[in-house]
């Protein structure tokens, strides 16, 4: 890359010291960058891109990181919110790779050798291995998150494109400098083709790859999706409690989504986990049964448990607002609600109820009749059947026969439907496979889960989704418009202006650097000629 001593100022020496960890000045024969150094610089650039990509992945996965936290708790038995840790580690990796890459580019511009120190080489390899391990782990354990990442590009691609254009434009100066420094024609042509090939692809990205439902006119924007509280309002109150039910109503949500199990004596109650240890004080009340299945406890035993103190000891969501004094006192006194009790409270708050029904263990008394036990509890509550959104597929035909006014919710598209569905409840990753307009024409409403971040809510809003299940109803309630909305003509104008400005800057940089290189060659030839004249005169 560099083939001349270049500037030997203190500034350049400091940069070289940080990059190579050597303060001493190199002799002339060592002032050149070897092929090995070029390979390491390429690895540095690759590491920067990998760490930047991993930062993007981390930011997108924050929407689903509560699943990761619960997964680790089930396997390790210790609760920790990994949001801050993930962001901190990835930010450090990106910062280190960015600073090292910046040092390398500045050294190249100063004509200094790119002798990367062994410590930096080891750290770069560790970063590559760490990112690779993260990607492999993501692919093995949470493969559905790749669908989340692809979906996120519909929300971020227009802005990533502008960032990519800015980045390739800034990269033009060191590329032009390298182009005019190297002499063999082959490497010069290869460098030029590679750089301008990548540049052309970036310029044409909106035409080739970018599409988003939020590129639309304001008048075409669908109505704001309704909100479904995921286990209630778990950022404001302990999940699956009556306090969480009340907070859901205060958020303006229309539906309370919960999970139902059947106790050992046949009482349906609210609980998500197969073990009670995460959301109750079972460890202190029944220490010998801490690993027992939630359905193995009788209703009398479940009533002895506290379902709120854990929420005050370890807030499950990073960044959630602290509770006021009255809310803290209410949370401390929460217990596990029975389904019948919940239905009566929901009716008073004008909330609908949607729930997952979890089958008890095989040796359970109600293993075969848990659906009937749950249905009996619903009917015994003497509430409107229309307020219950029935999601379980088990014995659905019998449920419809006994409770015909109950709304049937399907958790899949197609399949063995017992009637024409009116509601679909699907993961948000299924959005690309859905034809929302066609479903609406068939009078089918679509609810997608679990949506916590404004960027994702905005995307689903633009796509015309009817409602979303969320942990952050208090946040999404405040949104009056999507985060961004661009009319097609305006986006086209931004795209053209951005590309044209970049093209002008690229041409200017290459012309300017070419002029500098020409003057340097002329000056060098003049100096050589004067030296020969002086030598001839001295003879």
Swiss-Prot record:
EC identifiers of the protein: 3.1.4.43
Cofactors required: Ca(2+)
Subcellular locations according to the entry: Cell membrane; Cytoplasm; Cytoplasm, Cytoskeleton
Tissue expression as described in the entry: Detected in spleen, femur and calvaria.
Record-annotated membrane-spanning stretches: 41-61, 84-104, 122-142, 155-175, 190-210, 492-512
GP-PDE domain boundaries: 225-480
Domain of life (superkingdom): Eukaryota
Disulfide bonds: none
GO cellular component, one term: actin filament
Residues carrying a glycan: 333
InterPro entries with a match to the protein in the record: GP_PDE_dom, PLC-like_Pdiesterase_TIM-brl
Membrane topology according to the record: Multi-pass membrane protein
Extracellular-side segments: 62-83, 143-154, 211-491
Pfam families listed in its UniProt record: GDPD, GDPD_2
GO MF, one annotated term: glycerophosphoinositol inositolphosphodiesterase activity
Keywords: Cell membrane, Cytoplasm, Cytoskeleton, Glycoprotein, Hydrolase, Membrane, Metal-binding, Transmembrane, Transmembrane helix
Protein function: Has glycerophosphoinositol inositolphosphodiesterase activity and specifically hydrolyzes glycerophosphoinositol, with no activity for other substrates such as glycerophosphoinositol 4-phosphate, glycerophosphocholine, glycerophosphoethanolamine, and glycerophosphoserine. Accelerates the program of osteoblast differentiation and growth. May play a role in remodeling of the actin cytoskeleton.
Protein name per UniProt: Glycerophosphoinositol inositolphosphodiesterase GDPD2
Organism expressing this protein natively: Mus musculus (Mouse)
Gene: Gdpd2
């Amino acid at each position: 890359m560099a083939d001349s001593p270049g500037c030997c100022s203190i500034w350049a020496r400091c940069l070289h010291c940080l990059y190579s960890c050597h303060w001493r000045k190199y002799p002339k024969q060592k002032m050149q960058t070897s092929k090995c150094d070029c390979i390491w610089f390429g690895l540095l650039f690759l590491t920067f891109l990998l760490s930047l990509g991993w930062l993007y992945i981390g930011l997108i996965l924050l929407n689903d990181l509560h699943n990761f936290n619960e997964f680790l708790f089930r396997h390790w038995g210790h609760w920790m919110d990994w949001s801050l840790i993930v962001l901190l580690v990835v930010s450090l990796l990106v910062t280190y790779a960015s600073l090292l890459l910046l040092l390398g580019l500045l050294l190249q511009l100063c004509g200094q050798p790119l002798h990367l120190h062994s410590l930096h080489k080891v750290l770069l390899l560790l970063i590559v291995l760490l990112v690779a391990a993260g990607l492999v782990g993501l692919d093995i354990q949470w493969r559905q998150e790749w669908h989340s990442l692809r979906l996120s590009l519909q929300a971020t691609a227009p802005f990533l494109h502008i960032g990519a254009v800015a980045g390739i434009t800034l990269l033009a100066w060191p590329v032009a400098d390298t182009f005019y420094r190297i002499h063999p024609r082959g490497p010069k042509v290869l460098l030029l083709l590679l750089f301008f090939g990548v540049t052309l692809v970036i310029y044409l990205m909106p035409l080739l790859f970018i599409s988003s439902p939020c590129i639309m006119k304001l008048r075409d924007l669908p109505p704001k999706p309704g909100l479904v509280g995921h286990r209630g309002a778990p950022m404001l109150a302990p999940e699956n409690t009556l306090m969480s039910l009340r907070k859901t109503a205060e958020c303006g949500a229309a539906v309370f989504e919960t999970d139902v199990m059947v106790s050992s004596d046949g009482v349906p109650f609210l609980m998500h986990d197969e073990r009670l240890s995460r959301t109750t004080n079972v460890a202190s009340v029944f220490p010998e049964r801490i690993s027992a299945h939630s359905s193995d406890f009788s209703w009398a035993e479940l009533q002895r448990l506290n379902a709120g103190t854990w929420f005050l000891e370890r807030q499950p969501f990073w960044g959630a607002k602290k509770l006021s004094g009255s809310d803290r006192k209410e949370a401390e006194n929460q217990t596990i609600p029975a389904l019948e009790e919940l239905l009566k409270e929901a009716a008073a708050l004008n909330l609908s109820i949607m729930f997952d029904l979890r089958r008890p263990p095989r040796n359970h008394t109600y293993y075969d009749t848990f659906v009937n036990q749950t249905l009996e509890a619903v009917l015994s509550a003497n509430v409107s059947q229309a307020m219950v959104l029935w999601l379980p597929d088990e014995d659905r035909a019998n449920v419809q026969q006994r409770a015909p006014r109950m709304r049937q919710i399907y958790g899949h598209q197609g399949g063995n439907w017992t009637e024409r569905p009116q509601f679909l409840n699907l993961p948000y990753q299924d959005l690309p496979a859905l034809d929302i307009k066609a479903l609406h024409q068939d009078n089918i409403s679509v609810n997608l889960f679990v949506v916590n971040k404004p960027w994702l809510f905005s995307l689903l809003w633009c796509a015309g989704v009817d409602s979303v299940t969320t942990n952050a109803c208090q946040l999404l309630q405040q949104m009056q418009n999507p985060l961004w909305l661009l009319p097609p003509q305006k986006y086209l104008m931004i795209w053209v202006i951005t590309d044209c400005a970049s093209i002008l800057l690229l041409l200017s940089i290459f012309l300017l650097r070419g002029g500098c290189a020409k003057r340097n060659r002329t000056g060098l030839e003049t100096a050589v000629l004067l030296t020969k004249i002086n030598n001839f005169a001295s003879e």
